[in-house]
């Protein structure tokens, strides 16, 4: 269920400060964050944000199509290893 329009988009203040600082300085280093719940804002376009997936920080390069989505959508938390193979089918 999407967030109410009257509330507006959410972004953690500490992440917003880091992004503004990176934009001012023109720094190309990834902005490290644990805030997967923050919405991607237009001033983040062109930055690389390292989003934590529970184990490591996944670098996410922000493009204009990503605006309005959450950071966590681009850093998967689960790895799919495939289903168990059928032992009967392997023997034949």
Curated annotation (Swiss-Prot):
Source organism, top-level taxon: Bacteria
Cellular-component GO terms for this entry: cytoplasm; small ribosomal subunit
One Pfam family cited in the UniProt record for this chain: Ribosomal_S19
Protein name: Small ribosomal subunit protein uS19
Family according to the record: Belongs to the universal ribosomal protein uS19 family.
InterPro entries tied to this protein: Ribosomal_uS19, Ribosomal_uS19_bac-type, Ribosomal_uS19_CS, Ribosomal_uS19_SF
RNA-binding keyword on record: yes
Function, in words: Protein S19 forms a complex with S13 that binds strongly to the 16S ribosomal RNA.
Record key words, sorted: Ribonucleoprotein, Ribosomal protein, RNA-binding, rRNA-binding
Keyword RNA-binding: yes
């Amino acid at each position: 269920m999407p967030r109410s329009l009257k509330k507006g988009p959410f972004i953690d203040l500490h992440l917003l400060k880091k992004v503004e600082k990176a934009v001012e300085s023109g720094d190309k280093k990834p902005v490290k964050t644990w805030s997967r719940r923050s919405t991607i804002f237009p001033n983040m376009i062109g930055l690389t944000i390292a989003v934590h997936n529970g184990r490591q920080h996944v670098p996410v390069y922000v493009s204009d199509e990503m605006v309005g989505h959450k950071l966590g959508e681009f850093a998967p938390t689960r790895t799919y290893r495939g289903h168990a193979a059928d032992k009967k089918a392997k023997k034949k």
